[in-house]
A protein has these predicted regions:
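Conserved N-terminal phosphate-binding loop of PLP-dependent enzymes in the Aspartate aminotransferase
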Residues: 1-240
Length: 240
């Protein structure tokens, strides 16, 4: 039985140590001293939430926004990735006054009802009931096991399916609210998107009046090597 964790390790009660390779999207390990200290310091001053204005909320938002391209200039502090994606969906629907979503096969965006509805990783697996009527799934842009495996032009070819999904929505007399995609497909197999995929997909969505959402829950905040945000590797700027 695991008793505690420290940095990249887990420890049993008898002191046996394990390298933790299964803890999902841990960023800086367990009980990182700087994180523990920052949490202790804040708890000793104010247990903050969004109902109260506190200088540290503003300072955090400013530091976060400094890592993003200029057009992305507003930050909301929420409790989880699921809540962040729920908020993104609400904003996209409010802005476009549409409901239909274009999503990627085997994508995962959270465990709330609305997030499961747009997560092929959930609704197409055991216990799932398939995509809801307002959700349109495009093929996973995987150049290793996917339908297009050549390096050149595969990004455009996969993105063309986004255009096809838009045309399907329009044929039903509706419009598209948004396209949501993990900047690196995480639960789908840690798949790096082919070059040009997001640029082409985003253009199709914007031409249709929709909003482009980059899900960076598992890939953002410095996890993508030279890029602080994984969408930067595709040379794009999302709307949300």
């Amino acid at each position: 039985m695991v008793q505690r964790g420290y940095m990249q390790y887990l420890y049993e009660a008898d002191g046996r140590k394990y390298l933790d390779t299964v803890n999902n999207v841990a960023h800086v390990g367990h009980e990182h001293p700087r994180i523990v200290r920052a949490g202790q310091d804040q708890m000793a001053v104010l247990n903050t939430n969004t109902r109260y204005l506190h200088k540290n909320i503003v300072a955090f938002a400013e530091k976060l926004l400094a890592t993003l391209p200029g057009p992305l200039s507003v930050a909301y502090v929420v409790n989880s990735g699921s809540e962040a994606n729920e908020l993104a969906l609400r904003m996209a629907k409010a802005y476009t006054r549409q409901k239909d979503m274009v999503v990627v096969e085997v994508g995962y965006h959270g465990n709330t009802n609305a997030c499961v509805d747009i997560s092929s990783y959930k609704f197409d697996r055991k216990g799932g009931t398939g995509a809801p009527g307002h959700v349109h799934v495009v093929p996973i842009p995987d150049t290793y096991r996917g339908i297009y495996r050549e390096k050149e032009e595969s990004g455009k070819r996969y993105a063309f399916h986004v255009k096809e999904a838009i045309e399907k929505v329009r044929s039903q007399g509706k419009g598209v609210a948004a396209f949501i995609c993990e900047s690196i497909l995480s639960c789908g197999g840690q798949i790096v998107l082919p070059e040009g995929y997001l640029k082409e997909a985003y253009q199709h969505i914007r031409n249709a009046g929709g909003v482009c959402i980059a899900d960076e829950v598992q890939t953002g905040c410095g996890r993508a090597g030279d890029y602080f945000w994984a969408f930067e590797s595709q040379g794009v700027v999302p709307d949300i």
